């Protein structure tokens, strides 16, 4: 008789202002989403009414893994996108297992900032990266945007429409694949499966 195993992974959901980070977490979370949204002020108020100032938090569970005995828990931590709250990203990225970087394909004016953010987030992390290109239906366009942000060719890139929960689940599927691949690589390098 096998015993039930619990696998919990921390996912950092980050990216520029109004990219769709909160939308992703709200679309896929199986628990009530904890948000720290307040009314947006200044020029940004014309883009969206509310903005995250500390973090968003949601969970996703996948039961029945490995002959029904294991459960995978994803703990999703969303960062603020505004520069003045950027320090929260450094706090939230501690002990992260995967970074999901969300960028809005319809906001090319944010790409330079997104490139800088991505470099800052990943510079000291050795974890998988998934780039979710929101408001995009084309794999080619999504790949071109991710390349422009400095993502390596090996990075998973997914076009998505994060107002649609099904699209959010596709992003989660990419996160799970990235976790599986990184776990397999780690086990192989430690003499695990071959």
For each feature predicted by the language model, list its residue ranges:
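Canonical P-loop GTPase G-domain recognition
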Residues: 137-194
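Short glycine-/polar-rich loops that comprise or flank the Walker A/P-loop
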Residues: 8, 95-98, 125-129, 153-156
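Conserved beta-strand segments of the P-loop GTPase G domain that flank and frequently precede/overlap
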Residues: 76-78, 100-105, 130-134, 159-161
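Inter-motif core of Ras-like GTPase G domains
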Residues: 84-107, 122-124
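Conserved C-terminal guanine-recognition region of P-loop GTPase G domains, centered on the G4
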Residues: 103-153
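Conserved G1/Walker A P-loop phosphate-binding module
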Residues: 1-49, 61-63
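Switch I (G2) and immediately adjacent beta-strands of P-loop GTPase domains
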Residues: 40-84
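Conserved catalytic network of the ASCE P-loop NTPase/AAA+ motor domain
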Residues: 52-53, 61-69, 90-95, 121-126
């Amino acid at each position: 008789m096998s015993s039930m195993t619990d696998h919990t992974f921390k996912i950092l959901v980050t990216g520029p202002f109004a990219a769709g980070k909160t939308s992703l977490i709200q679309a896929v979370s199986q628990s009530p989403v904890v948000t720290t949204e307040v009314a947006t002020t200044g020029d940004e108020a014309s883009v969206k009414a509310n903005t995250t100032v500390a973090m968003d938090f949601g969970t996703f569970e996948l039961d029945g893994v490995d002959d029904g005995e294991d459960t995978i828990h994803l703990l999703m931590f969303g960062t603020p996108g505004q520069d003045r709250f950027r320090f929260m990203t450094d706090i939230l990225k501690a002990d992260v297992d995967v970074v999901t970087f969300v960028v809005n394909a319809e906001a090319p004016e944010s790409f330079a900032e997104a490139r800088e953010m991505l470099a800052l987030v990943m510079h000291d992390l050795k974890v998988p990266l998934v780039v979710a290109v929101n408001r995009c239906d084309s794999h080619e366009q999504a790949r071109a945007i991710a390349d422009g942000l400095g993502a390596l060719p090996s990075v998973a890139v997914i076009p998505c429409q994060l107002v649609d929960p099904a699209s959010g689940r596709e992003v989660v599927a990419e996160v799970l694949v990235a976790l599986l691949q990184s776990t397999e690589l780690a086990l192989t390098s430690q003499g695990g499966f071959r």
